[in-house]
From Swiss-Prot:
DCTP binds at residues 107-112, 152, 166, 176. Belongs to the dCTP deaminase family. The active site is at residue 133. The keyword Hydrolase applies. GO terms for molecular function: dCTP deaminase activity; nucleotide binding. Its EC number is 3.5.4.13. GO terms for biological process: dUMP biosynthetic process; dUTP biosynthetic process; nucleobase-containing small molecule interconversion. This is dCTP deaminase. CDD domains: trimeric_dUTPase.
Length: 188
C-alpha cells in the first residue's frame, strides 16, 4: 500500500473527477491553506454548519439522534462555542477509486488553537461530500472560516482491489450531500 503523490491526485481528479471542484495548486496567502500539496489534498469547509446546542437538555444518542440537538448556521465565519462541537461538510465532492482508501487529518493551524477536526476514512468506492466533525476544546469561542482549509486528505492505494467496496455494500452514507447526521441501519 503506497501513499500517493500530487501527480497521481491531479490525474485522478482531472481525468476521473475524484475531487470536484479540484484546486491544482496550494492556496495559502491570507487564508487557511487548501488545495493540492505534495502528498495530499487540503480540503475546504463549506459555509454550512450544524452547531450543537443544549437548549433541549437532551442526551446525545448516536442510535437515536435528535435533530433538535443542533442548530443550522450558514455564513462565512462559524463561531463554535467553548467546549462545544459542530458538524460541517466539505466544499469538495469525492469519488473514491475502488483500490484507494483516504485518511483525513486536521490542519495544524486549527489544532494549535485547540480546534480538533475528525473525519473517518474515505473507503474505496465511497462517493459524496465529507461530513466534518469539529471540536472546540478551549474555554473560549472559536472561529471556523468557511471556504478555507480545514483538513488534509492522504490517499493510500492498495496492493490489490478489495473484494467489496463501500458502494457495493450500499454504505449508509453513500452519495451524501450536505451535512449528514448519524445514521443507524434498522434491523430487518
Amino acid at each position: 500500500m503506497g501513499l500517493k503523490p500530487d501527480k497521481w491526485i491531479r490525474e485522478k481528479s482531472l481525468n476521473e473527477a475524484m475531487i470536484t471542484p479540484f484546486c491544482e495548486g496550494l492556496v495559502g496567502e491570507g487564508v487557511v491553506s487548501y488545495g493540492l500539496s505534495s502528498y495530499g489534498y487540503d480540503i475546504r469547509v463549506s459555509d454550512e454548519f450544524k452547531i450543537f446546542t443544549n437548549i433541549n437538555a437532551e442526551v446525545v444518542d448516536p442510535k437515536d439522534f435528535n435533530e433538535n440537538n443542533v442548530v443550522d448556521f450558514k455564513g462565512d465565519i462559524c463561531i463554535v462555542p467553548p467546549n462545544s462541537f459542530a458538524l460541517a461538510r466539505t466544499v469538495e465532492y469525492f469519488r473514491m477509486p475502488k483500490d484507494t482508501l483516504a485518511i483525513c487529518l486536521g490542519k495544524s493551524t486549527y489544532a494549535r488553537c485547540g480546534i480538533i477536526v475528525n473525519v473517518t476514512p474515505f473507503e474505496p468506492g465511497f462517493e459524496g461530500h465529507i461530513t466534518i466533525e469539529i471540536s472546540n476544546t478551549t474555554p473560549l469561542p472559536a472561529k471556523i472560516y468557511a471556504n478555507e482549509g480545514i483538513a488534509q486528505v492522504l490517499f493510500l492505494e492498495g496492493d490489490e482491489q478489495c473484494e467489496t467496496t463501500y458502494s457495493d455494500r450500499k454504505g449508509k452514507y453513500q452519495s451524501q450531500t450536505g451535512i449528514t447526521l448519524p445514521r443507524i441501519l434498522k434491523q430487518q
